Amino acid sequence: MTNFIPSLTDWHALHALSITMLDLAHSGKWDELIEQEMNYVQLVEGIARNPISPGNTFLINQAKEILNAVLRNEAELKTLLQHRMEELRQLIDQTGKQQSVSTTYGNLAGNILFPSNLNQ
């Protein structure tokens, strides 16, 4: 016989972890957020392995409420991650431009440009 109580415990743990991950994202602690992702996946897998008894409508309704809260947190987290990806994309673009400028000026090192050369 399957023990259904731990499954609801896992639901609560999943919700708590989703809040923690959201807090980490709001704080800009991206490395810590990534570290928590594996725990999140493991909790989801645990929930999938230990479903709530179909006849227990009380627990099913509680799980639905928790799931809705988790999904709201995931949607907000996804938005924050998209903003972070855009920030990183801009940093990468900026770094590429800086390298291009450095390379160009590096190629001109040792060359002296005189104003008379500009009029020709």
From Swiss-Prot:
Residue span of region Required for homodimerization: 1-50
Residues covered by region (FliD binding): 59-97
Any one of the GO CC terms: cytosol
Pfam families recorded: FliT (PF05400)
Presence of the UniProt keyword Transcription in the record: yes
Keyword field: Bacterial flagellum biogenesis, Chaperone, Cytoplasm, Repressor, Transcription, Transcription regulation
Localization of this protein: Cytoplasm, Cytosol
Superkingdom: Bacteria
Gene3D superfamilies named in the record: Flagellar protein flit
One GO process term, biological-process aspect: bacterial-type flagellum organization
Principal subcellular localization: cytoplasm
InterPro entries: FliT (IPR008622)
Role description: Dual-function protein that regulates the transcription of class 2 flagellar operons and that also acts as an export chaperone for the filament-capping protein FliD. As a transcriptional regulator, acts as an anti-FlhDC factor; it directly binds FlhC, thus inhibiting the binding of the FlhC/FlhD complex to class 2 promoters, resulting in decreased expression of class 2 flagellar operons. As a chaperone, effects FliD transition to the membrane by preventing its premature polymerization, and by directing it to the export apparatus.
Subunit structure: Homodimer. Interacts with FliD and FlhC.
Family: Belongs to the FliT family.
Protein's name in the database: Flagellar protein FliT
